[in-house]
UniProtKB/Swiss-Prot annotation:
<keyword id="KW-1015">Disulfide bond</keyword>
<dbReference type="GO" id="GO:0005576">
    <property type="term" value="C:extracellular region"/>
</dbReference>
<keyword id="KW-0964">Secreted</keyword>
<dbReference type="GO" id="GO:0090729">
    <property type="term" value="F:toxin activity"/>
</dbReference>
<keyword id="KW-0027">Amidation</keyword>
<protein>
    <recommendedName>
        <fullName>Turripeptide XIV-18</fullName>
    </recommendedName>
</protein>
<keyword id="KW-0528">Neurotoxin</keyword>
<keyword id="KW-0800">Toxin</keyword>
<feature type="modified residue" description="Isoleucine amide">
    <location>
        <position position="30"/>
    </location>
</feature>
Length: 32
């Protein structure tokens, strides 16, 4: 998630922001 400034790996590690990171992570996977 370049916009959020948090890498997908970090998102996966942070369960607290799982919702925000999850959406971002999915977008990255779908985008690629």
């Amino acid at each position: 998630c370049e916009d959020g400034g948090v890498p997908s790996a970090s998102c996966r590690a942070n369960t607290e922001d799982y919702r925000y990171c999850n959406a971002c992570y999915l977008q990255e996977v779908i985008g690629k």
